[in-house]
Regions:
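NTP-binding/hydrolysis catalytic cores, primarily Walker-type P-loop NTPases
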Residues: 171-217
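Gly/Ala-rich phosphate-binding loop of Rossmann-like dinucleotide-binding domains
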Residues: 23, 27-28, 97
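Beta-strand-loop-alpha "switch" segments that mediate conformational coupling across diverse proteins
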Residues: 139-190
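P-loop/Walker-type NTP enzyme "switch/lid" segment
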Residues: 2-17, 32-83, 89-94
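Short, acidic/turn-prone active-site loops that include or flank metal/cofactor-
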Residues: 107-114, 162-165
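Inter-motif core of Ras-like GTPase G domains
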Residues: 90-111
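Conserved C-terminal guanine-recognition region of P-loop GTPase G domains, centered on the G4
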Residues: 115-126
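Hydrophobic anchor at the start of a short beta-strand
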Residues: 31-33, 84, 103, 127-128
Length: 217
């Protein structure tokens, strides 16, 4: 009997490094993963090399034991996958957003981004805020208080650490397409562990054991 896949949506600032590394973790945990890029400028698409014989805008691309597409995932056999990760960018007009099990909103403390999120008409599902932290201080409470005071409904606010090394990794992903877990910085790895264990209910020991394979995976 086929099982409905878990749909996880990502909204807001660039987060294709998180999406790709999370997908790679899921693959290491024995899960079949489909990644869909619904963002306006196809920011995640640049990370996936397409064979000459395939059109990344219309064809399903198989890369690094994961499937990737740039268009409507519903035209494929969804039941084949355990998880479907969707990058929406800032576009929340996509109907599929209402089918997501979780939504992760990626923002920083810039006021225009925070205010934009307040005006989003999001479905009544589990929403998590990932705060991009470009500083050596914990700004999570600032963001949390802002959204609470403005009656924005979310389950939890996590720090999404972003160092110079993380920014370098993002550029390298687009140019060299090297999705290797040993390249993940420790703070980002900790965030991925939190998502897998706390939100997706994977066994903690199993998740932490993946670090043994970082040099080859």
């Amino acid at each position: 009997m086929s099982t409905k896949p878990h749909l996880i949506g990502f909204i807001g600032l660039d987060s294709y490094d998180l999406i790709l590394f999370l997908a790679k973790y899921l693959e290491n945990l024995g899960q079949s993963v489909l990644i869909a890029d619904y963002s306006k400028f196809g920011r995640l698409s640049y990370c996936i090399p397409a064979p000459v014989s395939l059109n990344p805008k219309t064809d399903l691309i198989r890369y690094n034991n994961m499937d990737f597409l740039r268009h409507d995932y519903e035209s494929f056999q969804r039941e084949e996958y355990n998880y479907i990760l969707i990058d929406f960018g800032w576009d929340i007009s996509q109907e599929v957003i209402h089918s997501c099990d979780f939504l992760y909103i990626i923002t920083d403390l810039q006021q225009q981004n925070m205010e934009h999120i307040l005006h989003m008409n999001l479905p009544n599902i589990s929403v998590y805020i990932l705060l991009k932290n470009f500083f050596h201080i914990n700004n999570r409470n600032n963001a949390k208080d802002y959204f609470v005071e403005n009656h924005f409904n979310f389950k939890k606010c996590y720090l999404f650490p972003t160092s110079v090394k993380d920014l370098e990794n993002m550029v390298m992903l687009q140019y060299y397409h090297d999705i290797k877990l040993h390249k993940v910085t420790k703070p980002l790895r900790n965030l991925i562990h939190t998502i897998l264990i706390d939100n997706l209910d994977f066994d903690e020991k199993e998740v932490l054991s993946i670090k043994r394979f970082h040099k080859t995976k």
